C-alpha cells in the first residue's frame, strides 16, 4: 500500500510539476479563458525575474493580452518549429516599459525551455522588455545553442507553470489569423500570491 502511494505521488509530480520552492515568488495570471499560476525563479534568473515582477507589481499586464499563438501548423517558413503562447502589456502602455534587460542565457541559469516554462520574448540579445511566452511543450531549440533564433543565444527562461496548463493549451487553440490570436485573449489581472 505504501509503495502504491509513492508511485501515485511520483506520477502526480510528473503530471502537475514540482511545487514552488520555498521563497520562490508565485504569480497568478487571470485571463478571459482561465487562470495560470507560475513560480518565478529569482535565484537562477534574477535579472529576468526582477524585470517580470516589476511589470506585475506596477499592474502593467492588467488589460494586456495573449496576442500570439505558435503551433506546429502556423510556421510554414520555419524549419525549427515551436509551440508557445506569447503575451504582453496593453499597447497603449508601451511608453511605460522599462529599459531592455540583459539576456540571461540558459547555459548560465541552468533553466530549460520545457512544457510550462515561462520566458521573455526578444528580438536580438539584450532586447527583452515586457513580452513573455509560455512553452506548450518541451522546446530545446529555445535554449542557448538552440536553432530557433539565428544568433543561437536562446531566450531567458525564468519560471514555470504550477497550475493552469489546460488554460495555456486552450489559449494556444484559440482562433487566430496566422500566429495572431483573433481576438487576443485578454489578461484581466496579474498579481503576486502571498507567501506560504
Regions found by a protein language model. Name each.
Residues 2, 17-196:
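Cyclophilin-like peptidyl-prolyl cis-trans isomerases
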Amino acid at each position: 500500500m505504501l509503495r502504491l502511494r509513492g508511485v501515485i505521488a511520483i506520477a502526480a509530480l510528473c503530471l502537475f510539476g514540482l511545487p514552488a520552492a520555498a521563497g520562490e515568488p508565485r504569480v497568478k495570471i487571470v485571463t478571459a479563458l482561465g487562470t495560470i499560476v507560475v513560480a518565478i525563479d529569482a535565484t537562477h534568473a534574477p535579472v529576468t525575474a526582477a524585470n517580470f515582477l516589476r511589470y506585475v507589481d506596477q499592474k502593467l499586464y492588467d488589460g494586456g493580452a495573449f496576442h500570439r499563438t505558435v503551433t506546429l501548423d502556423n510556421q510554414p517558413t520555419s524549419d525549427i518549429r515551436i509551440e508557445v503562447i506569447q503575451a504582453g502589456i496593453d499597447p497603449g502602455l508601451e511608453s511605460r516599459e522599462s529599459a531592455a534587460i540583459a539576456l540571461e542565457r540558459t547555459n548560465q541559469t541552468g533553466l530549460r525551455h520545457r512544457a510550462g516554462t515561462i520566458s521573455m520574448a526578444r528580438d536580438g540579445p539584450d532586447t527583452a522588455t515586457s513580452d513573455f511566452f509560455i512553452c506548450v511543450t518541451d522546446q530545446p531549440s529555445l535554449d542557448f545553442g538552440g536553432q530557433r533564433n539565428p544568433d543561437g543565444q536562446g531566450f531567458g527562461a525564468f519560471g514555470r507553470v504550477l497550475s493552469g496548463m489546460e488554460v495555456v493549451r486552450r489559449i494556444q487553440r484559440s482562433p487566430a489569423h496566422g500566429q495572431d490570436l483573433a481576438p487576443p485573449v485578454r489578461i484581466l489581472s496579474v498579481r503576486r500570491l502571498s507567501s506560504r
